[in-house]
């Protein structure tokens, strides 16, 4: 985490830029009990199917994401969120447009 973002009002849209043919991430808070990470996915890019031991809160802040959880695909648009349940396989793709999201993971049972 960078101390340069603490105790400041910042515009999320400008903290992370899209990069051609890439997925870019920036961890903005990391604590023993959880993390907050910003992601920017260029169109056509994504994260392959995986699972995590904790629930994950995904808030799309720009564009539109295709998020598949346990085989069911959801379209999540700017201003919307979805919770990916612990231990369920999930994948994320920028199919229709590039998108930015905030991932919040709380490490608790």
How would you name each of these model-derived features?
Residues 40-42, 53-67:
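Short, conserved beta-strand element in jelly-roll/cupin
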Residues 35, 64-66, 73, 89, ...:
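Structural motif
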Residues 86-109:
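Ligand-binding loop in jelly-roll beta-barrel domains
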Residues 71-86:
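Short acidic-glycine-tyrosine-enriched beta hairpin
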Residues 1-33, 68:
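A short, N-terminal "cap"/entry segment at the start of jelly-roll beta-barrel domains
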Residues 33-34, 43-45, 62-64, 108-109:
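Short, charged/polar surface micro-motifs in flexible loops or helix N-caps
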Residues 22, 36-52:
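Conserved short histidine dyad/triad with adjacent acidic residue
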């Amino acid at each position: 985490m960078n101390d340069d973002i603490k105790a400041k009002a910042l515009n999320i849209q400008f903290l992370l830029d899209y990069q051609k043919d890439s997925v870019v991430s920036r961890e903005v808070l990391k604590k023993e009990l959880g993390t907050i990470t910003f992601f920017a996915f260029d169109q056509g890019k994504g994260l392959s199917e995986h699972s995590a031991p904790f629930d994950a809160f995904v808030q799309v802040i720009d564009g539109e994401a295709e998020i598949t959880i346990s085989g069911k695909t959801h379209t999540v648009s700017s201003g919307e969120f979805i919770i990916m349940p612990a231990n369920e396989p999930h994948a994320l793709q920028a199919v229709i447009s590039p998108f930015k999201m905030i991932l919040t993971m709380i490490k608790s049972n």
